Amino acid sequence: MAVERKFVADGVRKVRVERHLGHELKRAGYGGMDLIRTPLGTQVTIFAEKPGIVIGKGGKVVRTLTQDLATTYGVESPQIEVQQVDNPNLNAQIMAERLASALERGWYFRKAGSSTLRRIMDSGALGCEVVISGKLTGARGRVQKFTEGYIKHSGDPVNTLVDKGYAVAIKKLGVIGVQVRLIPPGAQLPDHFEVTAAVTKKQRNMAHITRIPSEYDEEDLDLDAIVNEPDDFMEEE
């Protein structure tokens, strides 16, 4: 198989695994997964709000998932690890699933979208964008965006800093797509910088003083006089 075809096949396999886990672990608060190849096989890390449901009684569920990944999706020697999501409000996939569930239960899309945005920002996110698209109020499709804070749309930070989630709400008029994008707190943005105060000559000279000569009496010592001495005095000492 050519290298290009191999990359495409790996990408398609990852998307299929993502969809399968999202469908099977919906009750567990599925929050995404990482798939990493190792010399011993494939490490699959599942993030969930309720890890106990992912593992199952006696590990039954996780064994079934391992078998499905190996046989149905061709994942080489899958080793599943389950991690609990510390703050579900800062997980884009979990919030997208919650928003889709609220729309299916009959919530008005503006109320559901703004409530989701407010909950994410109140949890400390640097920025968030919620996009709801589909037949929201009538027969014609439309797109509604809710944005607050700082969010990146291009460049490498989109892949490294922005957490993305997607879900679908099924209603009588048709399906509604939900996208949630957020930047978690503490993210180091490339265009962020801090301006520090200028260092005066007196402060710079104070930083060079490491000891007080023994011939000086501490009570009569004039630090300002020592600090303001020329540089050649410091070198002679």
UniProtKB/Swiss-Prot annotation:
InterPro entries: KH_dom, KH_dom-like_a/b, KH_dom_type_2, KH_sf_prok-type, Ribosomal_S3_C_sf, Ribosomal_uS3_arc, Ribosomal_uS3_C, Ribosomal_uS3_euk/arc. One of its GO terms (cellular component) is cytosolic small ribosomal subunit. Pfam families: KH_2, Ribosomal_S3_C. Keywords: Ribonucleoprotein, Ribosomal protein, RNA-binding, rRNA-binding. Coiled coil: none annotated. GO terms for biological process: translation. Residues 17-86 form the KH type-2 domain. SUPFAM superfamilies: Prokaryotic type KH domain (KH-domain type II), Ribosomal protein S3 C-terminal domain. SMART domains: KH. One of its GO terms (molecular function) is structural constituent of ribosome. Part of the 30S ribosomal subunit. Belongs to the universal ribosomal protein uS3 family. PANTHER family: 30S/40S RIBOSOMAL PROTEIN S3, SMALL RIBOSOMAL SUBUNIT PROTEIN US3. Binds the lower part of the 30S subunit head. This is Small ribosomal subunit protein uS3. The lineage of its organism: Archaea, Methanobacteriati, Methanobacteriota, Stenosarchaea group, Methanomicrobia.
